């Protein structure tokens, strides 16, 4: 996967966030302050603008990290900050490389997962985006370790991401604004989890071209 293919992945993420922003708003209104759709729109616009032109660098790591910086400037909300951190950590993992293979992508996903957990100061099981990203990263890395190609690993990543979202849906939110409404969040899809699935679906779709 070279920088042109990474650019395609970023554009797919931007389109997916824009397409799902109303759904994310609805989910967030049920258990938060209802602004996640606005954040998704800002992230989509920032990523679209960033990837609108041909990449100015061949270095995949730098290109991904700079995309994270663009998100951070445009959407400094909780989710925006977490996703910006994820991209910057992922990019740092492969800085200096003009292409990435399945093993590199596994390292990038793991770095993104660790970055989100450190920045968010929480871990799996608290009904946050981590409950999507963490199992997704583990599933991708596990598949690659078994010799799977990128497309197969991406499929397993998506299965784990969706299962992670669904597993915590019955739970009560314990982190962030959603925790303020307590038991009302039980049985509701966490908007951060849904956003994580949307993003990973877009990334996975781009691997079909590799």
Short names for language-model regions:
Residues 1-210:
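N-terminal loops that bind phosphate or other acidic moieties
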